């Protein structure tokens, strides 16, 4: 994977440097390059999820098993995680997620707009803080 350019490659390097060993995701065009990099790396277990909330449980299980995990999702996926996000605050484990935003300027799908507007408030309410 030579000629690295762009944020997906930079983020991949950060994940590797932080010893992230599991990456969960629902297939997403916004994260396609990052997903491809994770799949190609034998040190990272890429986990295709049925729904984003499974990624919260994946991260918890990884932490309990002595590994670090990350969840990749779209802003609409945050809505799918609302109940499961309580696990993070209650059990106080670290949670790393990277969210591609939908429903912002020039969004072609109006159904994406409400969750886009709610993403940061939901994360703040459920886990106490969100770094955007």
Please identify what each model-predicted range represents:
Residues 1-129:
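Thiamine diphosphate
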């Amino acid at each position: 994977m030579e000629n690295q350019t762009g944020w997906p490659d930079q983020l991949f390097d950060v994940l590797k440097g932080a010893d992230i060993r599991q990456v969960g995701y629902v297939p997403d065009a916004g994260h396609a390059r990052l997903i491809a990099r994770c799949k190609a790396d034998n040190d990272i277990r890429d986990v295709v999820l049925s729904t984003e909330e499974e990624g919260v449980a994946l991260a918890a299980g990884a932490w309990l098993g002595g590994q670090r995990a990350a969840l990749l999702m779209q802003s609409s996926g945050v809505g799918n995680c609302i109940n499961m996000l309580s696990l993070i605050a209650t059990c106080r484990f670290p949670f790393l997620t990277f969210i591609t935003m939908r429903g912002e300027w020039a969004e072609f799908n109006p159904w994406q707009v409400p969750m886009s507007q709610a993403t940061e408030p939901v994360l703040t309410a459920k886990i106490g803080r969100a770094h955007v």
